[in-house]
Amino acid sequence: MIYLCDYKGIDFIAMQECGRYYKHQNVSEGVNTVFDLLQNRMENPTLDNQACFLVFDEWSGFLASVPKKQQEEFKQKLASILMLGRGVGIFLLLAMQRCDTTNFLSGARDNFGVALGLGRLSKESARMLFSDEADLIEPKPRGHGYLRVDGQPTVEIVIPKIRDMSITDKVIKNALCE
């Protein structure tokens, strides 16, 4: 089960007819829905929870668009999903162009199991994603970058270019609309 929050409302526009697709000003509804699911699963524990993924594109852009009080509320919900979600089958995937600590509550970022940085990372983004190895991070061309999984040493990676995006769109749409 995937919930897709597309703040810009552009990159995943092909998904707009899916019930778990949220764009622009409606992305808060997607976060709230997954947070409510987290609360429900914690109050009614079971061993057979269906895996749930909250995919949020442009978290920092979304935060910049809401008043400070709401920013803190959403940061708290995101921190709860990060810190408690894995235990009840809820996972988070965030994408943003500029990653820095102001987008998260203190300590929340340490709960990301996987960090992926692509292209020309700023020093702040490198510190945020790869704190202990930030000085080793160098700018990379498009599709090249760094990956850290569960605290293991950071490795350089290359992301293959998708030749036919329609196939990828179909796979995403099937997961969103199921």
Segments the model singles out, each with a brief description of its role:
Residues 1-53, 60-121, 130, 137-139, ...:
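P-loop NTPase catalytic phosphate-binding loop
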Residues 6, 56-58, 120, 149-151, ...:
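Flexible glycine-/small-residue-rich
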Residues 124-178:
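Conserved P-loop NTPase
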